[in-house]
């Protein structure tokens, strides 16, 4: 049964009760450092593998990842250096291999264990594209190794490592931008064309397709943004649009990023957006990692009551 506040907002949108430990991980067996958010209570917990946006770092998402982890999930956020999108996907695959080898166990608090059978992947901006690319490589379950990684075409790869991805979420994903570092495109512009077998949630922002200050290119241009990622996802898939917010409004306060920000004069705050995204993650995880779909169903049916901000539209495609 869904738990709600007195005003009807679901408790998934509030910080959970779990005490979270933040762990910086550097290892010769890793292709890059990690920022890990771990519950501290004894037990086994699902894993979120989260990829940051272009020119950002996991520290920019601390509030969001703390929110998610406080509901008893382990969040693993690689710290990518400045690299091409193709190299970023390759690095993400190496981190996934590290997880599948159960090496995360050694860095977690005592008696805290990762449930490698319950893994979700996600990311923001170009990190969202990286998450989709990883799921397209591993999510099809093709033991022969057929995968779609960065070009939008099916290519034969080596046998994939045994990492089961159970859920995929994109926060304002961007497939291709003005930078040469984001030159490849996984989109095919065919509905339901992504070759994956995992449930998908796409969270978009309504202002991310606009020019910043009337001069700078949009952060998430039409045709390569959240709408097209959702359009190409196979059911079950979900779409949530935070229409009054911009591409970087979910970052922690103090992040100085050029781009369109939220509309002024609205009662909603950036903190409310972070709460909303965190709550959507938690509800989606409950549904597809733990088999408890009540929260997600109620949010979809009554977003105006259950959510801290206006989500419009909210779309659910089950089959």
Regions found by a protein language model. Name each.
Residues 74, 79-83, 174, 245:
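Short beta-to-alpha linker loops that shape the active-site pocket of alpha/beta-hydrolase fold enzymes
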Residues 41-43, 69-70, 112-115, 121-126, ...:
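Extracellular/periplasmic catalytic domains that process cell-envelope and extracellular macromolecules
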Residues 1-43:
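N-terminal cap/lid segment of alpha/beta-hydrolase-fold proteins
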Residues 56-78:
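Short amphipathic alpha-helix adjacent to the substrate-entry channel of hydrolases
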Residues 44-53:
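Short beta-strand element of the alpha/beta-hydrolase
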Residues 234, 243-248, 252-319:
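Alpha/beta-hydrolase-fold serine-hydrolase catalytic core, especially in secreted/extracellular enzymes
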Residues 86-130, 137-142:
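Gly/Ser-rich "nucleophile elbow"/oxyanion-hole loop immediately N-terminal to the catalytic nucleophile
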Residues 144-247:
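The feature captures the conserved acid-bearing segment of alpha/beta-hydrolase catalytic domains
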